[in-house]
């Protein structure tokens, strides 16, 4: 026991240090449910109201739940073998029409209405079922208004088991299991519910006389006290496993869970039970509900134990029970039922009690949320505890946690997200919904809206989740956007299991483009190139939210750009808006214009006249150019001057490249013909045109001093061609 107390103290210390922080950082995914009780009209409906008034009242309840920060409603639709919906199996509820079995007039279906209205507010709808209770109080059983002729207590009294002042459907009868399963599947098949939810009404506490049922179907359980207890637990097991199998086969996305009382078993051995008082009510033995087996076997998607004790309560301490349930989740969801109804009673006088319990839930990895009992007490707001939930604990919305064992396929992503400014500074978002899959599990049911002041927003950060829309409407109005403050938005699609798609594009509520101001820039080329940055031409660009980046239409310049150049400066602001303006960039430098002069002649005649030519490069642009000749073979070049002394006939082309001081290059080419007129013995070869068709030309060799006279007569230097 000493070790147990030390462990409890350690748990308290860890919890006290951690759950406050956890509370300040609410998770992105967390079930936040509210039980809405219809039995005795505890929360709804008022049986004397008109259908229109009842609808308005239910709408107000759902509005209140949504405003509190909830994401799931658990509406009691069958409290004592009756129906808050149109059923061929059980009569209309007394608490709806003031007469059991009488349909509402004018006709309406409260369950269908509740589903639609809950979904319209972006919440899940769970149909809350009392599986076995048939007559809540035998003192009123004879009242025909409460129990109509078609009620099971009238049609099949042999199915009932009386325990104290309560009558239940006998769990040991196969026909009872058939009936309850049929009722549940009637709801599942005809209504688009998100979940089926059982509460803790199994075998009630008290003397149970079920000998006849046991004797008729003992199924091998021995006729001992322990055997009878195991038989009763097996009766419940048979229904739980059957309902689970039936739901999975019909609509595998529908969630099935049970909310038992808060203590499974009491034991100092955690493998058996929780460290709670041996005298506390333990549903394993008092209600014959083996809930741990159900979750171990995967027969339920979640348990929601009603841990209706305050932190530090002797014998049934909240801070000792929650860790035990956390350790027994078996890879299913574990929610905690919270006792809102006890606020401002003995032990519950702290306005932070419920908020602290939620903080403790969040500090345990396998606790996936909580359900509040019940709506009227949230509405009553004792000690302003609901105000604290609304303003702090549930200030940011949360998505329901995913159930990977039910499915892992997410819907397609939304596209074409756009933002516009609505009335009163509201930000209107609209997008294109993804094309729905033929697979019901992948169809889009809702959208999650995210908002952040960071463009690269973290979708897993709970503070960035703004809302979950109703149904699959591809639009949303952010009425919480503060005037003068700017945000980024994106959207994801959610399927029935709240599995999330990839994100859409990101938009913002900044619709004002940047104010781009420019200045002119002047650049001097170096090595034939120069460059600028956006800052060189930015003359003080500004934006209402902030400039994210500046860019220029071109940043590099060459010798071809010498002179004035138009450049666009573009500014992208944080909201994704872009604007641009022109600037002039003056590029300084000189482009050479080389020319080549040849002297003393334009050609070389080997054997006659000058045998060496001088090629001289110059620049018409007046640049102080540097020159390079190509090809250099056969030239004696030094800077701008090159000497050409050929030794053979031919046509010789030479290129000179001029480079300015700024690294700009240009070329000029000259071609020098070389004629071979050498005849030997110092004579020069000439070709005379004879005019004869048989002998059109005649080659002669003459002395150099006679060449000019022959040239004047039409002779040409060199040998005759052909």
Model-derived features with residue positions:
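Active-site-adjacent "subsite" loops/lids of carbohydrate-active enzymes
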Residues: 37-55, 132-186, 190, 285-289
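Catalytic domains of carbohydrate-active enzymes, especially glycoside hydrolases
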Residues: 56-82
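Aromatic- and acidic-residue-enriched segments that line the glycan-binding/catalytic groove
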Residues: 83-98, 133-163, 200-223, 269-279
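Active-site neighborhood of glycoside hydrolase catalytic domains
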Residues: 179-183, 189-198, 202-276, 281-303, ...
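Substrate-binding cleft of secreted/luminal carbohydrate-active enzymes
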Residues: 288-292, 296-314, 330-406
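Pro/Thr/Ser/Gly-rich low-complexity, intrinsically disordered linker/stalk tracts
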Residues: 389-441, 483, 496-512
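Recognizes extended acidic, P/S/T-rich segments that occur
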Residues: 442-484
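Proline-threonine-serine-rich low-complexity tracts
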Residues: 512-641, 646-714
